C-alpha cells in the first residue's frame, strides 16, 4: 500500500525532526510506500507543494495522511483535504494541535468539511479524542504518539525528585500556567520537584 504524508519536513533546515519524518520512516520500515511533502519553509510554497503532491500521486496512493494543527497550519489540512475529496482520495488527519477544540467551536463549518469527511481522524491523546467526540465526530481513533521505548533505560530510584521540562511555546494556547500548577501540586508530595521551561 502507498501513502502520501503531508506535513512539515523541517529537519533539513536545522529544526528537530517532526512527526512526518519519524512516523513516515517507521511506516516505510513496516513496508508501506511513502511519498512525503513538504520541506518548503515559506507558507505559500509549502501549501502549493502539498497540493501538487496530492495531484501528482492521486492515482498511486490509497490514503493521504495529513498532520493537522490548530492555527495557521490548519489551512494545509483544509485545502489538501478538500482537494482529496474532489479527487476521491481517502484522507486521514493526524491531530496535533492542542487548540483544535477551540477551532472546532470557532469554525464548525470548516471543521465539519475536514473532519466529518475524513476516512478516520487520528488523535494521539485522549484529550483530543474526547474533544472531537464531544463535537459529534464518530470517526476518531486514539493512536498514541510512538516512542522507541528500547532507547530509554529504566532508572530505578530510591528517592524520587521530579524534574519537569516544558518544551512548548509560552503562547496562551499552550497553557503554560498549567505546568506551574502541576509543579505546585507535585511539591506537596515532593518538595524538591523542579520545573524548567524553555
Please provide the spans of the model-predicted regions.
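A short, charged, and often flexible helix/loop element on the N-terminal side
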Residues: 31-56, 65-77
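Membrane-proximal helix-turn-helix segments that form the acceptor-binding/catalytic region
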Residues: 82, 86-87, 104-120
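A short, histidine- and acid-enriched strand-loop-helix "catalytic/donor-clamping" loop
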Residues: 68-73, 89-105, 119-120
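N-terminal subdomain of nucleotide-sugar transferases
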Residues: 1-39
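Donor nucleotide-sugar binding/catalytic pocket of nucleotide-sugar-dependent glycosyltransferases
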Residues: 116-153, 173
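A conserved amphipathic alpha-helix that caps or lines the catalytic cleft of carbohydrate-
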Residues: 24, 81, 183-187
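Conserved donor-binding/catalytic core segment of Leloir-type glycosyltransferases
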Residues: 4, 156-187, 195-198
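Conserved alpha-helical elements of sugar-nucleotide-dependent glycosyltransferases
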Residues: 15-23, 76, 178, 182
Amino acid at each position: 500500500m502507498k501513502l502520501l504524508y503531508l506535513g512539515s519536513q523541517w529537519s533539513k533546515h536545522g529544526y528537530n525532526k517532526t512527526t512526518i519524518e519519524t512516523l513516515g520512516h517507521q511506516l516505510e520500515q513496516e513496508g508501506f510506500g511513502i511519498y512525503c511533502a513538504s520541506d518548503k519553509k515559506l507558507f505559500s510554497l509549502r501549501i502549493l507543494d502539498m497540493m501538487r503532491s496530492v495531484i501528482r500521486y492521486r492515482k498511486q496512493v490509497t490514503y493521504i495522511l495529513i498532520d493537522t494543527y490548530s492555527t495557521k497550519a490548519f489551512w494545509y489540512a483544509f485545502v489538501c483535504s478538500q482537494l482529496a475529496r474532489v479527487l476521491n482520495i481517502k484522507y486521514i488527519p493526524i491531530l496535533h494541535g492542542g487548540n483544535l477544540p477551540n477551532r472546532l467551536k470557532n469554525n464548525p463549518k470548516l471543521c465539519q468539511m475536514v473532519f466529518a469527511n475524513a476516512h478516520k481522524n487520528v488523535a494521539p491523546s485522549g484529550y483530543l479524542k474526547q474533544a472531537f467526540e464531544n463535537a459529534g465526530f464518530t470517526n476518531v481513533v486514539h493512536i498514541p504518539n510512538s516512542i522507541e521505548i528500547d532507547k530509554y533505560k529504566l532508572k530505578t530510584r530510591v528517592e524520587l525528585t521530579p524534574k519537569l521540562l516544558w518544551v512548548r511555546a509560552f503562547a496562551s494556547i499552550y497553557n503554560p500556567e498549567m505546568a506551574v500548577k502541576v509543579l505546585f501540586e507535585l511539591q506537596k508530595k515532593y518538595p524538591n520537584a523542579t520545573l524548567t521551561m524553555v
